[in-house]
């Protein structure tokens, strides 16, 4: 028994030894947890270090460097901060750098010190966008986080003085110069002003917010003019009656008022553009002619229509009516007036008459030398403008890029060649123009013009005539936006007459700029090209939503996935087509679908393709586009209630 017990004891001791070894080799749970915690703490410390790196504000020659990451944290507790937005490649920024460093050194000695910082606007795009930076360098002052524009010169003395002024504890922003108009004061202010610019805006409108600082800067500048030109604004959402009264349907809408009479504002929308435009608009719309010699020079050497009002004096009621009419057309034509009886005699008219005539180079035996209108006390300004517009074009005019909008009446017959009315080339120019006159006299319902081939090189290319090899080419532009090119051949009056006659009889095929027709067009969004616009968009049996886009347009790229989802959503509706067209590479063959920006979206309802509905909602998401379709669709297979 003893040997057996001894053997059992040995085995037991061996087992205990093995357990002890195993226990020593295995990791302790508490120990493992502690190690994991240490590792996590180290990682958190590393993250904190990274955050600290992001928030760290570096300094270069005394100027602090701010970026998208550290900006808000840095300015949060600062009373006043001077900022410069710059571009590394900007020459003006490089020239300004030493001056800015001197400014930083000076303001550092201020009590308390005022931080001076710079921001690379090309790399810190979020900040540049936030502060509407559009030029370099742009200087801003922050006062308790609020932006203060700096409009002075880029000198140490002027900038330091302005920053110190803003840093004073009792400094407050100056009141807005822009007047605020409501229904209570609108008529009083507007009726009393010789000229005033009024902006109708919506508080939520992005374009209005972008315009606001430029508008206020312009208001400040124009308030210093002599006499001052006031600028005002109307909240069109709160003042709905005023907005309706002046046909405000989009924002911002700007209108010029002269003693209460409204005129369209067609000028720029930035400070200097607004200032220059309003300064020009504040002058008289018509210039006085004192000497007969001036009229004679207009006739002999002029190259534009001559518009002259003949009146007794400035107190003549007809004169004021003429001024009102001239104001509405002052951007398109040059107006003149005279109180000279000698000039009236030369023009063969009595006082109170409006005379519209062409310089000698544009006169012909087929048309009157002048068109005269009698302006009475009962005459309306609209009748005067109608008379001017109706008679400003000669039988065959000179169409130029600068006045192309005068030639909006269609059909328009254009003859292209080297048009030059200078002394040396006038005879050659008139040689071809006279041939056009022979045809134009027989088609009074059409507008005829000659145009210089170099000025309209792009138009000739689109017509397929840029490489025709002919000295003279011709085309017809019709009211539907279509273009017809005359086959290149020897040009004469008979050839042009045959071309115009063929057009009148509907025997010509239009020239259409078009990408190739897609071979496979079965995707959720149909691709439309110039050659398929009529067959797809103008299909009378189908509702069509058409997007006009440009390949380079950022908004179009953002819209693309949403528009594709829209196509998928309605793919099962056979009588509804979701389509898109590159409007830069294809002709829109109907003038009812005007494309003035990208993207432009229209709904073309079945059976009424000449009245497309434009998508005006700023929210181009799936929900709003779907709602737009369902509001106007005539061919959805399900009812709107079900949708």
Curated annotation (Swiss-Prot):
* Residue positions where N6-acetyllysine is found in the record: 365
Q: Region entry Disordered: which residue ranges? A: 24-54
State the superkingdom: Eukaryota
What are the disulphide bonds in this sequence? 90-93, 205-208, 553-556
User: What catalytic reaction does the record list?
Assistant: Catalyzes the rearrangement of -S-S- bonds in proteins
The record ties this protein, via Gene3D superfamilies, to: Glutaredoxin (3.40.30.10)
Q: Where is the composition biased (Acidic residues)?
A: 27-54
Under PROSITE patterns, the record lists: ER_TARGET, THIOREDOXIN_1, THIOREDOXIN_2
Q: What Pfam family is a match, any one?
A: Thioredoxin_6
Hey, what's the signal peptide range on this chain? 1-20
Q: Which CDD domains does this one have? A: PDI_a_family, PDI_a_PDI_a'_C, PDI_b'_ERp72_ERp57, PDI_b_ERp72
Residue ranges annotated for the Thioredoxin domain, each copy included:
21-168, 170-300, 503-634
Name of this chain's protein? Protein disulfide-isomerase A4
Q: Which gene encodes it?
A: PDIA4
């Amino acid at each position: 028994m003893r040997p057996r017990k001894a053997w059992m004891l040995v085995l037991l001791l061996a087992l205990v030894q093995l357990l002890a070894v195993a226990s020593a080799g295995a990791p302790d749970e508490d120990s493992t947890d502690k190690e994991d915690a240490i590792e996590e703490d180290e990682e958190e410390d590393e993250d904190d270090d990274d955050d600290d790196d992001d928030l760290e504000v570096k300094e270069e020659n005394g100027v602090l460097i701010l970026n998208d990451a550290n900006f808000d944290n840095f300015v949060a507790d600062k009373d006043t901060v001077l900022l410069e937005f710059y571009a590394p490649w900007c020459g003006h920024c490089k020239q300004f750098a030493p001056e800015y460093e001197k400014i930083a050194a000076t303001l550092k000695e201020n009590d308390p010190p005022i931080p001076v910082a710079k921001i690379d606007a090309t790399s810190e795009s979020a900040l540049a966008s936030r502060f509407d930076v559009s030029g370099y360098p742009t200087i801003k002052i922050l006062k308790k986080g609020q932006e203060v524009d700096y409009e002075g010169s880029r000198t140490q003395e002027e900038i330091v003085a302005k920053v110190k002024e803003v840093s004073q504890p009792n400094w407050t922003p100056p009141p807005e110069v822009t007047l605020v108009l409501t229904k209570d004061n609108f008529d009083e202010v507007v009726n009393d002003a010789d000229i005033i610019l009024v902006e109708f805006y919506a508080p939520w409108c992005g374009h209005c917010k972008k315009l606001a600082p430029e508008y206020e800067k312009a208001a400040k500048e124009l308030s210093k003019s002599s006499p001052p030109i006031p600028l005002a604004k109307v909240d069109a959402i709160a003042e709905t009656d005023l907005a309706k009264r002046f046909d405000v349907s989009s924002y911002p809408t700007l209108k010029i008022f002269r003693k209460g009479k409204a005129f369209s504002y067609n000028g720029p929308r930035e400070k200097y553009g607004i200032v220059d435009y309003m300064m020009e608009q504040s002058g008289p719309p018509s210039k006085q002619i004192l000497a007969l010699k001036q009229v004679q020079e207009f006739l002999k050497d002029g190259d534009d229509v001559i518009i002259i009002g003949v009146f007794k004096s400035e107190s003549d009621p007809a004169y004021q009516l003429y001024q009102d009419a001239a104001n509405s057309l002052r951007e398109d034509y040059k107006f003149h007036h005279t109180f000279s009886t000698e000039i009236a005699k030369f023009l063969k008219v009595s006082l109170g008459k409006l005379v519209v005539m062409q310089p000698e180079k544009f006169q012909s035996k087929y048309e009157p030398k002048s068109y005269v209108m009698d302006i009475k006390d009962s005459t309306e300004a609209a009748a005067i403008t109608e008379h001017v517009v109706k008679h400003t074009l000669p039988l065959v005019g000179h169409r130029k890029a600068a006045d192309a909008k005068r030639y909006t009446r269609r059909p328009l017959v254009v003859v292209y060649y080297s048009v030059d009315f200078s002394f040396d080339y006038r005879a050659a120019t008139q040689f071809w123009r006279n041939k056009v006159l022979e045809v134009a006299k027989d088609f009074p319902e059409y507008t005829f013009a000659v145009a210089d081939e170099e000025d309209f090189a792009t138009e000739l290319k689109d017509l397929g005539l840029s490489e025709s090899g002919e000295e003279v080419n011709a085309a017809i532009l019709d009211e539907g936006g279509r273009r017809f090119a005359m086959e290149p051949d020897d040009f004469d009056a008979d050839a042009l007459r045959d071309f115009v006659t063929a057009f009148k009889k509907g025997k010509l095929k239009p020239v259409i700029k078009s990408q190739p027709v897609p071979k496979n067009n079965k995707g959720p969004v149909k691709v439309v090209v110039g050659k398929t616009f009529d067959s797809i968009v103008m299909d009378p049996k189908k509702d069509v939503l058409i997007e006009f886009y440009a390949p380079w347009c950022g908004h179009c790229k953002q819209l693309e996935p949403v528009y594709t989802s829209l196509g998928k959503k309605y793919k099962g509706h056979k009588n509804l087509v979701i389509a898109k067209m590159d409007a830069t590479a294809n002709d829109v063959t109907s003038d009812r679908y005007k494309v003035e920006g990208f993207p432009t979206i229209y709904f073309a309802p079945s059976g009424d393709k000449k009245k497309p509905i434009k998508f005006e909602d700023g929210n181009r998401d799936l929900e709003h586009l779907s709602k737009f379709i369902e509001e106007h669709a005539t061919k959805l297979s399900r009812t709107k209630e079900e949708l």
